[in-house]
Structure formats: C-alpha cells, structure tokens
Regions:
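Short, surface-exposed beta-strand/loop "edge" segments at domain boundaries and coil↔beta transitions
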Residues: 52-54, 82, 96-99
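Conserved catalytic cores of phosphodiester-cleaving nucleases, focusing on short active-site segments
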Residues: 30-49
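Helix-rich interaction surfaces within compact, conserved domain-sized segments
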Residues: 59, 87-128
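Acidic-basic catalytic patches of nuclease active cores, encompassing PD-(D/E)XK
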Residues: 1-26, 114-128
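Nucleic-acid nuclease catalytic cores
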Residues: 66-91
Length: 128
C-alpha cells in the first residue's frame, strides 16, 4: 500500500499511477506560507516520531535551495488525544543544524520568526 493508504486505508490513485508508469514524484509534507500574501516561507518534511533517525529529504532540500527558503525535517510525537507534545527538528537548508528537541511552543516561535522576517518585505503586510 501507499503511505496515504497507511493513514487513511484508501489508496492514492495518482501516486500509484505514477509508480506504475515509472514517473517519479514526491509530496512535500509542508510548505509554510505567509498569512497575508500567501508567499512560501519554508518547506518541511514531517514524520510521526517512532524513534527513527532518517527520512528522505534530498528533493525537498533541492527545492528549498532553488526557492531561497529554509527547510526542515520535523519528527513529532502526540499524546493520547493526538495533540502534538514534542518535536525533533533539524534545519536542512540553507545550513544544516543538529537535531533539536523542542516543545510545540518553541517550534511555534521559530515559525513566527520566519513570518516576522518575511513581514519586512511582505507586499500585503498588515500594519498594527
């Protein structure tokens, strides 16, 4: 089965069609966007944290470099109510960092910082 099928017990017909025809593609797990102008802020590969240390990120890193965006690998853990409780984050581009364990509030601060940095030149910045 496909990864999509693993989560939803249904197939992903487009992904399956691509594989059957040797057409290669990936899905980028996350593309953070500006809340005002919708420009991209970052790319991320995300994965439920089962203690693994690796996920394929080569294409996401290449796209991020081409777009001049930071990119991240994010492993996340959830509690029994499926609320994110911790994340292991590695910055992939422009400079690779060591993996860092962060709480959701810490990751939110990083994402908020990316929005703040973008706001300096945002074409639709909301003034407060």
């Amino acid at each position: 089965g496909t990864v999509h099928g693993n989560y939803f017990n249904t197939g992903d017909p487009y992904s399956e069609w691509c594989r059957e025809n040797n057409v290669y593609m990936i899905d980028v797990d996350a593309c953070g966007i500006c809340k005002n102008c919708k420009d991209p802020l970052y790319l991320a590969e995300t994965c439920f944290d089962r203690g693994q240390t690796w996920k394929a990120t080569k294409t996401t890193e290449a796209l991020a470099r081409l777009a001049g965006l930071p990119s991240f690998l994010v492993f996340y853990k959830v509690d029994k109510d499926r609320i994110v409780e911790s994340l292991r984050v590695t910055q992939l581009t422009p400079t690779r960092s060591q993996e860092t364990l962060v709480l959701p509030e810490g990751w939110f601060q990083i994402l908020e910082f990316l929005q703040d940095q973008h706001n300096i030149n945002c074409s639709k910045k909301v003034t407060q």
